Design a protein with these regions (language model features):
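Short hydrophobic/aromatic beta-strand micro-patches
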Residues: 57-59
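A short secondary-structure junction signal
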Residues: 129-135
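Active-site nucleotide-donor binding segment shared across nucleotidyl transfer reactions
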Residues: 21-54, 63
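Short, conserved charged micro-motifs
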Residues: 64-68
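Conserved catalytic core of two-metal-ion nucleotidyltransferases
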Residues: 1-27, 70-127, 146-189
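A generic "cationic amphipathic patch" detector
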Residues: 69-70, 132
């Protein structure tokens, strides 16, 4: 396994966050650091030493506004990438990426993007615990279908691990699953 110094990558991601922070302040958009980014900020006073990405969450209205105006609001070389502006984009959330770089992720070999930070929309949830569980189950079902549609079915072995993605591609499209997930995620806003 190759070893490399991850710090320059982390610092470039931090540059992206600073640009996003400036845009959010200028346009009164709310965002929060979340997941491993929040853990790193609290526990390590910065990045988790081995972390190679940054995660923020935005209330849906602010997220949609940022995605709609990112091309005009973000300074070059930063750009927002989401399914709404790139139909080959395989994820149910956005990335703000550095368009002057290329980052190849093993999980998404067909999608070439730049160094990035993830932007997750924060949506409403049902009131009851049962409805919340069903909502999560439905979300994770479609997220798995999305993964099967996008991944290379022959890269991960033979048998079921290769034919399930082929079967999913027969019955689902990337666009259809993305639109279903978006409607579902926004249904409690």
């Amino acid at each position: 396994m190759a070893t490399y110094d991850i710090r320059p990558l982390q610092l470039r991601i931090l540059d992206i966050l600073m640009a996003v922070d400036k845009v959010c302040k200028e346009h009164n958009l709310r965002y929060y650091i979340i997941a491993g980014t929040l853990l790193g900020a609290v526990r390590h006073k910065g990045f988790i030493p081995w972390d190679d990405d940054l995660d923020i969450g935005m209330p849906r209205a602010d997220y949609d506004l940022l995605m709609a105006h990112a091309a005009e609001w973000l300074p070059a070389p930063f750009e927002a990438v989401c399914f709404e502006n790139d139909t080959t984009y395989p994820l149910p959330f956005a990335k703000i990426q550095d368009g002057s770089t290329t980052l190849i992720e093993r999980m998404h070999l067909k999608y070439l993007g730049g160094i990035y930070l993830d932007v997750f929309p924060l949506d409403g949830m049902p009131d009851s615990k049962l409805a919340q569980r069903l909502h999560f189950m439905k979300y994770f079902f479609y997220k798995k279908i999305l993964y099967f549609i996008y991944r290379d079915p022959y890269r991960h072995g033979k048998g079921m691990s290769s034919w399930i993605p082929l079967l999913c591609r027969k019955f689902f499209t990337l666009k259809g699953v993305q639109e279903t997930m978006r409607r579902m995620m926004k249904s409690y806003d």
